[in-house]
Amino acid sequence: VSERKKADFQTAGVLAVAVAHFIHDVYSSFLAPLLPLLIEKLSLTLTQAGFLSTVMQIPALINPLIGHLADRVNVRIFIVLAPVTTAVPMSLLGVAPNYAVLLILLFAAGLSTSAFHVPAPVMVAELSGSRKGRGMSIFMTGGELARTVGPLCAVAAVSVFGLPRFYPVMVVGGLASIWLFAIFRRSAPPGKVQSSRSSILDSWRSLQKLMLPLGAILVFRGFMHGSLATFLPTFVNQETGNIWLAGSALTVFEAFGVAGVLLAGSMSDHLGRRNTLLISLIGAPVGLLAFTLTEGWLRVAMLMLTGFTLLSTTPVMLALVQEQARGRPAAANGFFMMLSFLARSAIVVVVGYVADLAGLRNTYLLSACLGILAIPFILMLPGKRQPGSS
């Protein structure tokens, strides 16, 4: 492959992986809208219902292992198979005769989800050449849109077929995998196969200068994200007493988040990864503080700013991880995604606990102040590596 080809942005390939991300994540978002029906069908307690989501996310703990494996085989295999291997268990949720089968189906879907999300950014990075940020933005937009459309698809399927009979929707996932196989067999890069016998520990040692500051950024950013993504409708309802406004606030936050995701990666190709993260993680705490303290249309504008800046950080961090991967691109992404999962899971519980003690308004102010603490860790991130470096 020529140097020019490596530098080219392969639009068709990047769009194909983004479409795969969209289709895959539509299926993986089925659980939340189906949960009330599953609770009723199987007479589940709320504790059992909550554990279903946890079981689906447990495989995220082995993301580094999946990445380690993906660096040794062709990453196309994971990406081509993922839509069907996630579609099948998620489409069978309504058929599950008991809680144990439900747990098995969701754990299988969680494994498939990890097996897609760890290597997919590696392929996007290869297809994006020198414009990795732009590639990651397009890839992440597919996932963000799926989170909006997926619940509607699940409800529509159950409305038409009924809960026990909506399983034929898995066919779309199967067709998507066949389509991806046809596309990537012809045009995709083979994926970098790591032939060395290095261990996961070796991979961590080579990546820790990147992962330690990134982990700290994920934690401090996580307080802001956990506060808003989980408790925004509750906060707005407490402030205004208007449930319609509460729901609309989350839609505004997510919509401007999608815009941020779509634009931030390309911005980081021109401004640099660290500079873009600095802009985002100065803008987000300022926006959250102002949102909490103001009223009326100014508050709406501050929510837009917060959504745009806070959610825009993910494609930039994905591009940064791939640039710094040092021959272990999937392992690097596996570590990043594991840290992201751990930070997100733990912090939502902490945010809920603080909100019980101090109220949501004070929790939002505290989260914004903690968000500012991410800034020194952004300055600790390694700079852009030269193409020839190893």
What is each model feature region?
Residues 268-317:
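C-terminal transmembrane helical hairpin of 12-TM major facilitator-type secondary transporters
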Residues 54-67, 251-263:
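Central cavity-lining transmembrane alpha-helices of secondary-active solute carriers
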Residues 61-99:
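Conserved MFS/SLC helix-loop-helix module at the cytosolic interface between two early adjacent transmembrane helices
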Residues 326-357:
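A late C-terminal transmembrane helix in Major Facilitator Superfamily
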Residues 105-142:
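Cytoplasmic helix-loop-helix junction between adjacent transmembrane helices
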Residues 31-32, 209-261:
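Extracytoplasmic gate region of multi-pass secondary transporters
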Residues 77-92, 275-290, 368:
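Structural signature of the two symmetry-related core transmembrane helices
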Residues 130, 139-185:
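Helix-loop-helix hairpin linking two adjacent transmembrane segments in secondary transporters
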